Amino acid sequence: MSIISEKFNAKITSLKEEFQINKDVVHQGIKGGLNEVEFSNLVSEIIPKKFKISKGIIENIEGEQSNETDFFIYDDEILPPYIKNDLAFVPVEATKYVFEIKSILNSTELKTTISKFSKYADLGGRAPTVLFSFSTDIQGSELDRYRKNDANFYTYPELMVLCVSDKGYYYKMVEEKYLIEILPIEEFIKNVKKEEDFKLKVGDTTISFDNLKQTNLTINSDSLKLNGIDYSKIKYKIHRWFGVENAGNIIELSLLSGISNTLCKEKFGKYLLHGKDPVFKVFSICFEDMWGNISCQDFDPNGLSYNLTDIEFTFSSNKENHKLLFNLKSN
C-alpha cells in the first residue's frame, strides 16, 4: 500500500468515527450538516485547485433553479468575477459533480434524491450525480432497490454514482461504438439477408441486392450506404452499471479514486487504490442503437456472469425505420 493510500485510508476511518460521534446529536439538521461538511472536506483533498466546493442553488440561463444541494464541485476558472461575488447561485455549466449525503439511506431518502437530481437534469445539468450514505436500512442490494425506483436505471439514470459505506460503490458508464468495429463490411456482405425496400449504394453507384456479392466494385469503410445510411457511421451505445461490494474502506477509496480520475488530467486516483485491487463486477447491461431502440436489458444483483463476447446482434433497415438489436447468445 502506498503512503497516499495509507493516509486516505486513515482519513476515511476518522470520517466513520466522526459519523458515530455525530449520532448523539439530537437535531437532525445539525447532525446531517456535520456529516456533509466532514465528507466534503475529504473530497476537497483529492480535487485540483481549479475546482471548488460549495453549497447552494444551481441555476440555468433561463433562471430556473435546482433544489438546494448538499454540496457540489464547480469549475472556478471559468466563472467571471460578477458570478464569483455571489456563489449562492452557480451556473449549471460550471458544475462538475453534484452530491447528496445521507446519514441513513431509506426508500424515502432515495426517492427524494432521485427527484432532486431529476430537476438538476431538467436544468441542463450533465455532471455526475452522487448519492453517498453512511449507513442503510436494508440488508439487500442497494443497486437493486435503486433500479426499482428509477425508470431510467438502465440508460440515463438520475444517479450516476451510488455509494453506501461498508457496503457498496456503484457507478454508471456508457460507451459509444460503431457497428463496423464488430462487423467489417466484408462480413456484413457475407451474412446480410435481403429485406423488402433494402436499397444499397456504393459511392455514387446504386447496386441491386442480388448483385452485391458478385460486384467488382471496391467497397471501403465509407463508401457503402444502406437505405441512405453510411455503414461506417452506424453506431450504438453500451450502458452498464459497475460496482464493488465490500465491508471496508475500499468503498470510500473507490469513490474518491473515481472522482479524482474524472477531474484530474492524470489518473491520480490509482494512488488511492494502490495495493487494494478491488474486484469490480458488471451488474447491469443495456444496448441502445443510434435510433433509440433498446435491447438486451439485463440485471443481476450478484453481478452478471457473462461478458460482451456472449452477445450477438441483428440489423434491419427499410424506408420507415432502422434497428440494431442485441441479445444474449443461446447456449
Pin down the residues of each PLM region.
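Intrinsically disordered, low-complexity Ser/Thr/Pro/Gly-rich regulatory segments
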Residues: M1-E68, I73-N331
